[in-house]
Amino acid sequence: MAKKKAPAPTAAELKDLAQRLETLLRLRTLPIGMRHFDDEASFDAVPGLRRPKPGRHFSTCQLVTQARVAGLTVGIRHENVRPWSNCGGVIGLNAPSDDYLSGRKMAGVWFADLKNARLHQAQMPRVTPGRHIGLVVSPLRSARLDPPDICLFYGTPGQTILFVNGLQHGRYKRYDMSITGESACADSWGRALATRKTSISIPCYAERRYGGVADDEMLVACPPDEFRRGVEGLEALSKVGLRYPIPPYGANMDPAEGMDVSYGAGGKRSA
């Protein structure tokens, strides 16, 4: 008989999981959640909601940074991001204008010609526009999104691979990264919001310039049930000594002594 799927974690459970993840991986900034809203009443009812000042336009990555660094719960509408841009387009709050979709905005900047700039736009993951009126970003520790659509955290490559190892511990699956290039938020929260699949990406130039993403940071976005599986898997790995930070063994040492502890003498673990 197939194993019954556990119910999705609640906001309270995700708060606890986020705290455990911070301890396990020693994260620099807060794990966050994102949730789409389809009506103004439920959007405005989110506890502690902050809205950008009217007339000010941000990149989505700037507003995400306000949540993960300052701990704010931020409500995002189309009028809060650059008008008819990919910022709103990636999260489904607008369709990008023809200036973007045609490639004119990025031709001669990120791409040599209009053809390649247009291909970049055509292949970019996006949430279908017209379904949602807003998106709220909030730290998981605040438990204000019950539940979020996706959970996210920024980590170093070492932290990221250990989280993937945690995801694979109890249910193996091969994970792929996608890289759009510039506008790589499409590969993280854009793809995860659109597909509800775990998405791993390297933040782009704009995320680092405007959103303040550190040079060594990657971004993981996943549905709440995968977030739980990753944290629980990390805890299981910790029990067998596979923890963060990863202690370097030394390039001039025989690895057998270390590997034998994990895998058994001669590379074979005893039954």
PLM region descriptions:
Residues 3-271:
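Acidic, serine/proline-rich low-complexity intrinsically disordered regions
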